[in-house]
Design a protein with these regions (language model features):
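Short glycine-biased active-site loop of nucleotidyltransferases that positions the nucleotide triphosphate
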Residues: 56-58
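Short, conserved clusters of charged catalytic residues that mark active-site
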Residues: 27, 117, 143
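Short glycine/proline- and acidic residue-enriched helix-loop micro-motifs
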Residues: 104-109
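Metal-dependent phosphoesterase core characteristic of DEDDh/y 3'-5' exonuclease domains
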Residues: 33-40, 60-64, 70-102, 123-203
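Core catalytic alpha/beta fold that binds nucleotide/phospho-ligands
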Residues: 115-117, 128
């Protein structure tokens, strides 16, 4: 889903979110735990990666665009933004399919930074925000809480996780907490459709 669409969906519903998914770094096979928790802030994240329209694909996904925004859920306001283009190193030339799908050009990724450098910049951005707004990813600590919001688990559970493993990059601990907004919107659709079904039945 488009990054701006995810963001606007969150703002329009002014969510009281729960069901944080916690993924441990060491084993992808470990179960995902869920807890009910309300948040004051969300960081909306939506990677773009290398991709192909062939099977098998010509390579593995590498992040090429790393955008994020911090949302205040009480107001719906965007408080801060982060954006970097990332230079792929395993398959440095973007496919025509990828460029058409993402709108990202070869020149943009050629001028991008390595993923490791991007993670360092992003971690610094996160640290400043946590200090500025006195927020924490640790839901066991009293105070204001924040987590990531993604469209499906692909961004953090698969794409970033696997690329960090392949490139032997240390993935920051805070990336192990996120909310799958797709599940939330599906729940909203079901809640809206159910009374419609009843109403249609009585016509």
């Amino acid at each position: 889903m488009d990054f701006s669409t995810v963001q606007s969906s969150l703002i329009s519903h002014k969510i009281e979110l729960g069901l944080v998914q916690k993924r441990q770094v060491k084993r992808m096979s470990q179960s995902t735990s869920k807890v009910n928790q309300k948040f004051e802030y969300l960081i909306v994240l939506d990677f773009e990666s290398t991709c192909w329209d062939t099977w098998p694909p010509a390579g593995q996904n590498e992040i090429i665009e790393f955008p994020a925004v911090l949302l205040d859920l009480s107001s719906g306001n965007t408080l801060s933004e982060f954006h970097e283009y990332v230079k792929p190193t395993e398959q440095s030339i973007l496919s025509s399919f990828c460029k058409n799908l993402t709108g990202i050009t070869q020149e943009q990724v050629d001028a991008g930074i390595p993923l490791g450098a991007c993670l360092c910049l992003f971690s610094s951005w996160i640290q400043k925000l946590c200090e500025q707004y006195q927020m924490s990813f640790n839901i066991s600590v009293p105070g204001k809480h924040v987590t990531f919001a993604t469209w499906s688990d692909w961004d953090l559970q698969i794409c970033l996780h696997r690329e960090c493993l392949r490139k032997q990059l240390k993935k920051p601990e805070f990336f192990n907490y996120w909310i799958d907004i797709r599940n939330f919107t599906i729940g909203l659709q079901k809640a809206w459709l159910e009374p419609c079904k009843i109403w249609a039945y009585h016509l």
